[in-house]
C-alpha cells in the first residue's frame, strides 16, 4: 500500500483503527514508495471494517465514509492513468487530460500530484511487461 512496511492497529472492542499513512484526510496521499493498486485494494478492505473511529496518518479523525471517498478518488485516478497508458499517452499527456477537480482542494496538491501520477504510470507500465 503506502509503503512496503505498512502497519495498522485494530482495537476491536473500541472499534478503533490506527491506520498510519495508509489513510490520510484533507491531504494528497504520497505515492512515492507505494504500490498504488495494492493501496486501493487495501482501502476497499478498510472501508468494510466496522470501525467507529479511524486515526489517519495525517489530518482529522476519519470514519468509513471518509475511507470510501478516499477509495473512490484513488481508484478513479488510477483508472484514468491506466486508460491513458493503454491509449499510448505519456504521463505528462495524461496529467493534462485528467479531471483533478476533486483533488485540487486537498493540501499539498501542487507538490504531490504530478509525482503521484508519474508513480502510478510507472507502476502500470511495469505491470504491462
Question: What residue spans do the PLM features occupy?
Answer:
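Metallo-beta-lactamase
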Residues: 4-80
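Accessory terminal helices/loops
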Residues: 48-50, 61-129
Amino acid at each position: 500500500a503506502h509503503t512496503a512496511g505498512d502497519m495498522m492497529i485494530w482495537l476491536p472492542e473500541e472499534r478503533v483503527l490506527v491506520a498510519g499513512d495508509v489513510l490520510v484526510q484533507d491531504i494528497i496521499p504520497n505515492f512515492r514508495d507505494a504500490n498504488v493498486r495494492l493501496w486501493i485494494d487495501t482501502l476497499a478492505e478498510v472501508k468494510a471494517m466496522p470501525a467507529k473511529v479511524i486515526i489517519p496518518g495525517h489530518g482529522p479523525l476519519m470514519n468509513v465514509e471518509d475511507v470510501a471517498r478516499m477509495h473512490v478518488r484513488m481508484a478513479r485516478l488510477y483508472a484514468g492513468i491506466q486508460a491513458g497508458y493503454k491509449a499510448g499517452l505519456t504521463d505528462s499527456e495524461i496529467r493534462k487530460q485528467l479531471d483533478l477537480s476533486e483533488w485540487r482542494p486537498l493540501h499539498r496538491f501542487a507538490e504531490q500530484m504530478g509525482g503521484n501520477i508519474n508513480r502510478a504510470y510507472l507502476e502500470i507500465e511495469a505491470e504491462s511487461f
